[in-house]
């Protein structure tokens, strides 16, 4: 019996189970609130003088996603409207913001069960080349 074929079959089976599972847990926006960046008092001459000023300007200097209210999310995040009217950062690019305004789902997934789960988009297919 060829053990390498059994091992490869086992790995492929695990990958397929992970890819075709019916749901994925959604990301909660509760702890992902962001600070509004409408304060334009940052002076270029002194923005790196203290640790505090460096923390305040770090996201501005290294590519950020600007939300409709002017707040910023780290690069490759998605701005989602939160239930309190502010914006929160979903930590995945091109995410789906759920209608409950408390969760988000990764790209190519849709919100289900009120936003508690993420389901693969209809018609989503995976192909494996040999």
From Swiss-Prot:
Granulins are disulfide bridged. SUPFAM superfamilies: Granulin repeat (SSF57277). It holds the Pfam family Granulin. The keyword Signal applies. This is Granulin. Keywords: Disulfide bond, Secreted, Signal. The keyword Signal applies. Disulfide bonds join 67-79, 73-89. It is found in: Secreted. InterPro entries: Granulin, Granulin_fam, Granulin_sf. Belongs to the granulin family. One of its GO terms (cellular component) is extracellular region. Residues 1-26 form the signal peptide. Its main location: secreted.
